[in-house]
């Protein structure tokens, strides 16, 4: 009798563990939520019904945890890791979706905007070739605006944006 109970228990445990791979984290079942602010951040959310990561625009504050900077990050967290290459690849997909060029985004000047929020952000400084902190006001910014230094560095990585020395070489050649 005890052997049968142990056998059935282990069988049920095995079934539960096998099905656990199909379980999506609860955050991934939340709907896309732009939040209550009016900034413009292209993001991805996991759509549990289609089992895909879809794009949406995040307003910069509020919202929920079903929000990712890249399709790859979204798929890794919610879709079982089948989302393709790293965050740089996801950044390129996001930019292409919005008809933006990564070099153009990373070349934009920092833009605080006219609103009075106090949101620490990072932008890529083309002159120094580094991601630097600035205070974003919460509205009317541009795409060179990242929540973390890591996101900025990933998006404006050396292979993605023109470096100051490349720009200088181009201008020097054009001057002659």
From Swiss-Prot:
Organism: Trittame loki (Brush-footed trapdoor spider)
Molecular-function GO terms, alphabetical: potassium channel regulator activity; serine-type endopeptidase inhibitor activity; toxin activity
Gene Ontology CC terms: extracellular space
Transmembrane segments: none
Protein name: Kunitz-type U19-barytoxin-Tl1a
Disulfide pattern: 28-78, 37-61, 53-74, 106-156, 115-139, 131-152
Gene Ontology biological-process entries: envenomation resulting in negative regulation of voltage-gated potassium channel activity in another organism
Keywords: Disulfide bond, Protease inhibitor, Repeat, Secreted, Serine protease inhibitor, Signal
Record family assignment: Belongs to the venom Kunitz-type family.
Record's signal peptide: 1-18
Cellular localization per UniProt: Secreted
Note: This protein was not detected in the venom by mass spectrometry.
Free-text tissue specificity from the UniProt record: Expressed by the venom gland.
